[in-house]
Amino acid sequence: LEAFVFEPLADAIERDDFCSLAPIGWLHHKMQDSFFLVVGTHSCQGFLQTALGVMIFAKPRFATAVLDEDDLSGRDALEGLLPIVEAIVAEHKPGAIFLASTCTPEILKMNITGCAPPLEEKFGVRVYPCRLDGFDPSYTQGEDHVLEAMIARAPETSEKNLVILGCLSALEEAEVRLECETMDLPVPRFLPNESALDLPPIGPNTVLAAVHPYLFGSVAYAARERGCAIHKTIFPYGPDGSRAFYEGLAAAFGKTVSYEAREREAWGACEREVEAIRGRSVAFISDAMLELPIARTLRAAGATVPLVGTPNIYKKFHALELARLEGVDVIERPDRFAMYARLSEHKPDLVVANLNIANALEGMGFSVKWSTELSFQPIHGFNGAPSLFGLFAASLRRHDALAKIRGKTQTEAAPIDLDFFRFDGAPLSLRAPHALREAPQPSSPLPDPTGATSAALAPSPSHEVRH
């Protein structure tokens, strides 16, 4: 699909992001009749048990089929999954099972997708195969793969209808229904909803509106396979985004409406939170793929956004958001050391960062907000705007309180000078981004049992050293 061709503008190949199994947290709560069976390792099992915070005796609706040595030798995956799925069906009686392939099965080229049809036929339960591995740029794209698997099973239709794509809370869904009713639009269907079996019909006359900026895969799949029309506006984050979203929905059905008064009312309801944000600077170096729309609405609230680092940019899908970030340094797949230097230059009041580097940034003197907080909060639409701005207002108030305690009036970032040590004890200083300074050699080489000296074993200054 030409409209969704990816044009890389990468800062670095490496990336720092959360696990792609994280969307199970909100998806299994949304779809009450679902069960997520993850085919992976003990690391996957540990993540699900700790990150999602559910005790075993609570009978959670997710589990891990742990790979063992037999699986590594090429054993048929279906053979090992049969007794596990049988136990799940007997105990939980799910309406649908999501069979999730993780990093290890993908590397081993295990045919997890091919196991879905025979499992569905044998146990009479719908099985959605999906990929929840760490090869995607962002952990939130796990939801994208789940929705793509569901769209493939959705019934076809020739009628004009509206489908809202993306997991929303009950409050957020209620707002969309109310606004569509007010505009006299078709009753919207949601994917996902409370049942994993209740799939909205999708066809060439369907208007598909994605509410998350990371759903480009499922949107492209629906457009390619079903020929549906894609709702192209900015995403419904903040009063400005919500206004554009609803006015765009009306235009898709041939209606002209104005949400100017509704937007003004929403800004008034957020005034206390916006007051704490106005005039402050916020930078992003995170992994949620929510950075573009949230940076846009923070600018509309009066904040300064000097820097936005995001895991992935699809120029066509994100074009309208990028157009509203003119003058902002937007970096795709940012290199952490280069970003440290940029942050040191801009000295923002708040940095939205992923968990991997949050503590490091705190140690450098920055005030940090975890990017994962944005994924688990109801921040869409007019009603979600106070929650969205409240997240940033609370962090900035904390920043001000700590600054008073420390006797500082603004962020005083520590200089970027991280000392690493070679095996022979000679220090190497790494100055961002990727500037390697040669360290002095020790005056007397360390003895080596083989007769060689540590100086001879030390890497040449011309070699690239990566940390």
PLM features per residue range, with description:
Residues 1-467:
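An N-terminal assembly and electron-transfer interface module characteristic of large anaerobic redox
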